[in-house]
């Protein structure tokens, strides 16, 4: 509030630094990013802030890779090692929930590792994929399915998981990426009109919440519009042709073969 850009807080373990920061967050009342140097500390602070701010949206944003091996080439043995990665779906869901919370609420606190400094989807692109469903409005069902697919949702009429949806008669069920407890959003329609939007447990039938309006956010944090994807494909193809030409002109047949 005094216009200071930086404030250093020193103290040994157990001296109440987290509690002090929590009081600052409460007084400033702004969206907050708490950046730490590893996942272990991030998990610890995430739990502590959840206890200190039970009514705020406290989120967790760390790297979603359980394993990552970048591509490499060993000239001596002419060995090419392809890129390999294993992603953690639960952490991916938490990352998406964190991004959605920033767009939806002003009382968001995100505890993050250094993974948060790397670029994500263009915020404007991400916002363009967000849309609302309202009780009483008329919808074009095919257009709704298209919007869901554009937002990276996958249609699965058998097994519902975060980031999927299914259609059964006049009922559309969607599992937002931020739902981790097995709940679904069920949209009841009569013809093209939305009659009811509820959050329920599909196994017990228990209704958790009734909505008049429900926002649909992208299923993944790296979501882009069709237009941006088409633009990227043109750029990628142009760069491919440029590199192929370079390798051919310099007699690098092996590199040319790999790209082709």
Task: Locate each region found by the language model.
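ASCE RecA-like P-loop NTPase motor cores
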Residues: 1-260
């Amino acid at each position: 509030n005094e216009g200071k850009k930086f404030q250093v807080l020193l103290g040994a373990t157990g001296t109440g630094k987290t509690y002090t920061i929590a009081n600052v967050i409460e007084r400033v009342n702004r969206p907050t990013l708490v950046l730490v140097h590893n996942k272990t500390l991030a998990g610890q602070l995430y739990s502590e802030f959840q206890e200190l701010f039970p009514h705020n949206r406290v989120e967790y944003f760390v790297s979603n890779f359980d394993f990552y091996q970048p591509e490499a080439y060993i000239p001596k043995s002419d060995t090419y090692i392809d890129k390999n990665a294993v992603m953690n779906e639960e952490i991916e869901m938490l990352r998406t929930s964190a991004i959605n919370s920033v767009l939806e609420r002003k009382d968001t606190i995100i505890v993050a590792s250094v993974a948060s400094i790397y670029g994500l989807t263009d915020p404007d692109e991400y916002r363009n994929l967000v849309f609302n469903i309202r009780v009483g409005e008329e919808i074009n069902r095919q257009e709704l399915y298209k919007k869901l697919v554009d937002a990276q949702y996958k249609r699965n009429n058998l097994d519902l998981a975060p980031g999927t949806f299914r259609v059964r008669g006049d009922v559309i069920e969607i599992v937002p990426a931020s739902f981790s407890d097995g709940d679904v959003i069920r949209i009841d329609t009569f013809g093209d009109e939305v009659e009811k939007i509820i959050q329920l447990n599909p196994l017990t039938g228990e209704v958790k919440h009734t909505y008049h309006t429900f926002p649909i956010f992208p299923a993944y944090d790296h979501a882009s519009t069709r237009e941006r994807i088409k633009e990227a494909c043109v750029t990628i193809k142009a760069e491919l042709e440029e590199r192929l030409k370079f390798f051919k002109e310099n007699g690098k047949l092996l590199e040319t073969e790999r790209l082709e």
